A protein has these predicted regions:
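Membrane-interfacial loop-to-transmembrane-helix junctions in polytopic alpha-helical membrane proteins
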Residues: 24, 55-61, 91-94, 113-122, ...
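N-terminal hydrophobic segments of proteins, predominantly signal-anchor/transmembrane helices
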Residues: 29-50, 55-133
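N-terminal alpha-helical transmembrane segments of multi-pass membrane transport
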Residues: 1-31, 38-39
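Transmembrane alpha-helical segments and their membrane-water interfaces
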Residues: 13-24, 37, 72-87, 109-172
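Alpha-helical hydrophobic membrane-insertion segments
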Residues: 3-14, 65, 101-104, 108, ...
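Membrane-interface helix-loop-helix junctions at transmembrane boundaries of multi-pass membrane enzymes
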Residues: 20-30, 79-98, 235-253
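Alpha-helical transmembrane segments of multi-pass inner-membrane proteins
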Residues: 103-111, 134, 150-177, 188-266, ...
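Membrane-embedded alpha-helical segments of multi-pass membrane proteins
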Residues: 6-17, 41-42, 59-80, 126-134, ...
Length: 283
């Protein structure tokens, strides 16, 4: 496992260097590629590194590298442009205003003395919420041409198929990838959380009756199910707007894989959300 972890670290460091280089050149599109190629596997990468090296400090460096990339991209956009940030003419949409209000509420609840959590912990919690706003902000100001968009769609399709195949393999062999990678021990050492449930992972990995829920290469079944909502939206859009019957058949098969993946992850909230997405898409 140490060989796999070493190769993974080398590839990741090289990829981060490439992404940061492109970001400093002013191309925020590569931040989106970073999200697509790393975040779905982020928790699994941490498990592999921990199992390979057994070093908590190394895992923490890896974990916070994501924050470094996002905040660096944000600062480059704010201060690295020839045109001053203040000189921009902002035309806010309803979604922009909702996001701005959401981030403002987060900032207020971080600063006011509410709750028992210490101020440092509140800042750490708020950081993850601010990352959502940063990604939205950068995406809002990134121009993506048709060629790049087609590549993004291909990556999303590969993630859909890949996650289904992983979950199907877990189902067939009656195991969890996280169990193979010692998720229980990782959670105990890194987060001081003891393993729970019938599979030595956490209760998130099973539903009522002790039946397993699978996460594929995502961190847990809930994250897997949430990602399926994005895959569902992509499949529905191209199914309804494709001009060719062969393409429609392919996207119909993709939606079938998404449906089966919902069964593997079994998140009732995500299943209800998928029904809402289908309803508003069709009507």
């Amino acid at each position: 496992m140490i060989v796999v972890a070493t190769i993974l670290l080398i590839l990741y460091i090289g990829f981060i260097g490439f992404v940061l280089k492109k970001i400093f050149e002013g191309d925020a599109y590569y931040l989106l590629l970073y999200i697509l190629f790393t975040l779905p596997f982020y928790a699994t990468f941490q498990l592999i590194i921990f199992k390979g090296f057994d070093l908590s400090a190394l895992v923490n460096v890896f974990k916070y590298s994501k924050d470094f990339v996002f905040f660096t991209a944000f600062l480059v956009f704010i201060f690295g442009k020839k045109k001053s940030f203040i000189e921009y003419k902002w035309e806010l949409t309803l979604l922009d205003k909702l996001f701005l209000g959401f981030i403002t509420l987060t900032l207020i609840y971080t600063l006011i003395p509410l709750g028992e959590a210490p101020f440092l912990s509140k800042i750490i919690y708020a950081k993850n919420t601010f990352l959502i706003g940063i990604v939205y902000f950068l995406g809002r100001h990134t121009n993506i041409d048709k060629q790049r968009w087609r590549f993004i769609v291909k990556v999303l399709i590969y993630l859909t198929v890949g996650s289904f195949l992983f979950a199907l393999s877990e189902k067939i062999f009656g195991t969890h990838l996280q169990g193979i990678l010692d998720y229980g021990r990782f959670n105990l050492v890194m987060n001081d959380i003891f393993p729970t449930g019938n599979y030595g992972l956490s209760w998130t990995f099973e539903r009522q009756g002790g039946f397993p829920r699978y996460a594929a290469f995502f961190s847990n079944p809930l994250e897997f199910a949430a990602s399926l909502l994005l895959f569902l939206s992509v499949g529905l859009h191209y199914l309804l707007h494709s001009k060719y019957n062969s393409n429609r058949l392919a996207y119909l098969c993709l939606l079938l894989l998404v449906t089966l993946s919902f069964f593997f992850s079994y998140s009732r909230g995500a299943i209800i959300a998928s029904g809402i997405i289908v309803f508003f898409t069709l009507f």
